[in-house]
Amino acid sequence: MTPLVKDIIMSSTRMPALFLGHGSPMNVLEDNLYTRSWQKLGMTLPRPQAIVVVSAHWFTRGTGVTAMETPPTIHDFGGFPQALYDTHYPAPGSPALAQRLVELLAPIPVTLDKEAWGFDHGSWGVLIKMYPDADIPMVQLSIDSSKPAAWHFEMGRKLAALRDEGIMLVASGNVVHNLRTVKWHGDSSPYPWATSFNEYVKANLTWQGPVEQHPLVNYLDHEGGTLSNPTPEHYLPLLYVLGAWDGQEPITIPVEGIEMGSLSMLSVQIG
């Protein structure tokens, strides 16, 4: 077992698991309801010894994990102010934690990525508010685009063990994410279907039963599911956090809101 994992495995404080609605990259530069919520989480939650991030913006064929000592800050967006591109989040990586994930997720093959990726705005865009000093070791786990929703929920179950090792699970996405219907100007009130789906998610956070029957695994069965998520990558991170729930811990909503008609900023806290 690697030294880092040996050190943290005896942690007596169970770390929470978070799903954060990250929204626009502009949140990095702004002070608003959502960014203040992320700041409060960083100030009030137990400080983790390391963080595993699942971001909507690393959507791959197969599963990968960042395994470099100093992951780069990825500015995976275009058309924003230069100040955003000048912002970096130099949190250290953790090859030891990456190797721990390889062992924990076996027999699922996990590729150790030492050069292709880093921390994208789905991860650093929220963590720069939670932990602005960028001094907590982090790895980012990719989302396998070839797998069904139930598989991602089960991945959360596997990752749950890390919470007892001093490691926080942070998943970043948006449960309603339809950029084709975003209201860029004028009336920005939520579409009825966006509100309906957002409420459906909230109502089923504590559902218990067979994974294959979970309403949030079968989210496309909801009448607003496809409109709310024409592609799955921003929704699936939620399932990692729900999979890490033990069925008894409190589930709370640190902040919520729907911006520009069809962008949910709902956040969910486990523990």
Curated annotation (Swiss-Prot):
Optimum pH is 8.0. SUPFAM superfamilies: LigB-like (SSF53213). It is found in: Cytoplasm. It catalyses: L-dopa + O2 = 4-(L-alanin-3-yl)-2-hydroxy-cis,cis-muconate 6-semialdehyde + H(+). Zn(2+) binds at H22, H57, H177, H234. Disulfide bonds: none annotated. It comes from the Bacteria. Its EC number is 1.13.11.29. The keyword ATP-binding does not apply. InterPro entries: Extradiol_dOase_DODA, Xdiol_dOase_suB. One of its GO terms (cellular component) is cytoplasm. Keywords: Cytoplasm, Dioxygenase, Metal-binding, Oxidoreductase, Zinc. GO terms for molecular function: ferrous iron binding; stizolobate synthase activity; zinc ion binding. Monomer. Belongs to the DODA-type extradiol aromatic ring-opening dioxygenase family. This is 4,5-DOPA dioxygenase extradiol. It comes from Escherichia coli (strain K12).
